[in-house]
Design a protein with these regions (language model features):
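C-terminal beta-sandwich/jelly-roll accessory domains of carbohydrate-active enzymes
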Residues: 115-281
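Generic serine detector
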Residues: 7, 15-18, 24, 56-59, ...
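Catalytic-core region of carbohydrate-active enzymes that cleave or remodel glycosidic bonds
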Residues: 1-102
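Charge-patterned, long linear interaction tracts outside catalytic cores
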Residues: 88-133
Length: 281
């Protein structure tokens, strides 16, 4: 088990930034025995985390299709090879705000031998990110497709084929190009993605995913949430997400609830809005 109630947000956010930063997908192969005591699972382990598994499909589609455009600019700093290999001298001054909006990285230098072209570093990104954060409280990527609201702890993905509203979104409204998202839960990860190479606007089928927190039955944490006191047992309990999503396209949709195998279980409640949007509850 993994004592982190908000871990569902990890996969779609990492997938989005892999596109922005042009990171190559990495496969972690490992063996793991079953254990009896409480332990903290690895970040990439979806086997025992149902909310992560539920979002693996949309996260994979985003990465494979390249839904998020690559940043064409970035901010870089130099670091010596000796400093890079030291746990004491390895220090960088890349602002966190810049990391949210564009590529960042280092150029290794040693005896005038340099790996990477530091002249490609866009120094203006530091002031640009700082000004944006100060004036709006939000950080929007240079591509315009990713937005982090630092104050309200929310994250938006807004591309042609995948859109999402993630984080502590309860009581707020995520306004995206093809979807308006409103959730009553304090924390949720809600994504809408095309199931083809077409955009959401033109897709024949869409996948709407809505997950939140989870825990084992009778699982207990310390008051600060940093320590698991009781691991609990099966069945795993997943929080039901309540609210609605307005799909703002010209299509007429049927909406179905799916089980863990992707099979239809029942029709979801829908309602046509005056502006032509289809509201799914």
């Amino acid at each position: 088990v993994e004592p982190l109630l908000y871990s569902a947000e990890g996969a779609p956010i990492m997938s989005a930034y892999s596109g922005l930063l042009n990171l190559s997908p990495i496969v972690f192969a490992f063996a793991q025995d079953y254990v009896e005591d409480a332990y903290m699972g690895v970040a990439f382990d979806t086997r025992e985390v149902p909310t992560k598994a539920a979002l693996s499909y949309v996260s994979g589609l985003m990465a494979i299709r390249g839904d998020v455009a690559e940043s064409q600019t970035g901010y870089y700093e130099t670091v010596s090879r000796s400093a890079a290999s030291s746990t004491i001298d390895y220090k960088l001054d890349i602002p966190t705000a810049v990391k949210r909006i564009a590529k960042t990285g280092v150029c290794l230098t040693d005896n005038e031998d340099q790996t990477g072209d530091i002249t490609k570093s866009n120094e203006a990104l530091k002031d640009y990110a700082e000004k944006m954060l100060k004036e709006t409280g939000k950080l929007t990527s240079v591509t315009g497709e990713l937005r982090t609201d630092m104050e309200n702890e929310t994250f938006e993905i807004n591309t042609e084929r995948t859109q999402g509203y993630i984080g502590k979104i309860g009581g707020k409204k995520g306004v995206l190009n093809n979807a308006d998202i409103c959730a009553e839960n304090n924390f949720a990860v809600i994504t809408l993605t095309s199931l083809s190479e077409s955009s959401i606007e033109n897709a024949d089928k869409l996948l709407l995913s809505a997950v939140g927190r989870w825990r084992n039955t009778d699982m207990r944490f310390s008051d600060d949430g940093n320590k698991m006191l009781l691991t609990g047992d099966t069945p795993m309990l997943c929080e039901q997400i309540t609210g609605y999503v307005d799909i703002k396209t010209s299509g007429n949709y049927e909406a179905w609830c799916l089980d863990q195998s992707g099979q239809r279980t029942k029709a979801a409640k829908t309602e046509k809005q005056e502006n032509g949007a289809t509201r799914i509850y």
